[in-house]
Curated annotation (Swiss-Prot):
One of its GO terms (cellular component) is cytoplasm. It comes from Nostoc sp. (strain PCC 7120 / SAG 25.82 / UTEX 2576). Mg(2+) binds at residue 257. Its cofactor is Mg(2+). Binds 2 magnesium ions per tetramer. GO terms for molecular function: ATP binding; magnesium ion binding; phenylalanine-tRNA ligase activity; tRNA binding. Keywords: Aminoacyl-tRNA synthetase, ATP-binding, Cytoplasm, Ligase, Magnesium, Metal-binding, Nucleotide-binding, Protein biosynthesis. It is found in: Cytoplasm. Disulfide bonds: none annotated. It catalyses: tRNA(Phe) + L-phenylalanine + ATP = L-phenylalanyl-tRNA(Phe) + AMP + diphosphate + H(+). Its main location: cytoplasm. This is Phenylalanine--tRNA ligase alpha subunit.
Amino acid sequence: MTSNLEAQLLALRQEGEQAIAAADTLERLEELRVSYLGKKGQLGALLRSMGQMSAEERPKIGAIANTVKEALQASLDKQRESLESAQIQAQLDAETLDVTMPGIYKPQGRIHPLNGIIDRALDVFVGLGYTVAQGLEMETDYYNFEALNTPPDHPARDMQDTFYLPDGNLLRTHTSSVQIRYMEKEEPPIHIVAPGRVYRRDNVDATHSAVFHQIELLAIDEGLTFTDLKGTIKVFLQAMFGDLPIRFRASYFPFTEPSAEVDLQWNGRWLEVMGCGMVDPNVMKSVGYNPEIYTGFAAGFGVERFAMVLHQIDDIRRLYASDLRFLRQF
């Protein structure tokens, strides 16, 4: 019986090693492991007959059985390693990039030229210690006109057509209304810059739009003078346009006195770029400030005009057309 069982064990080893070597998938290899070395496998079935052997025969058969088990396990490990390596290599081959193929196009967004001007301007003023203030686009007549020294019968109202709403409110014609609301809530000293969209009943053409953007600044403190205003504007324009000549021309605005227009020498000619002036005492009084104690200055400019000058844009309507051929230039 011993020689018969020994022969069966050796035959099982030979058969198992051949089957394992022929396995071409990890799933098939696992099936063979269970078939030969599992609890109900072929090797276990042969070893269960050892109970009928004598005590002298069992050690010999046990040693042979261990050798067979170790040999089959070694074959399984070797084949598994080989199959796993082949599987990884196949995956790498399938994922190998063809460097001659064009990549996947991922378009990048760009900053709109108007947003770019607003960001640059705010960076300058924030660097000078100004706070960014926001306000309502739908305003009352009081905040848009009356508090800014422009009563209902004032001739300055003819300077700009206004969009009036059925409820008596209006679409703001400038961001100066932000300054009034801010001053009502805060005590001097004040240094704010107010960007925003404004509305006027202009005929749309190459240089005019019914909706555009303004940025206005306001400073209120004791002892502020026109010299402080000129210095602030000079620093700002140098940051935006470089060290170019500027000049101040006497002008009129109902909410500043004295008032001035600011011109910039650009490509050999003077361009009007800003309006400015010292805050009118009547504006101070409308928000409860004492003009005998405080003085202030204000200035403003159109964002679209700055964008058109800096980027050499010939038609303001291009800024609103959402034409990617145009916007991709910035």
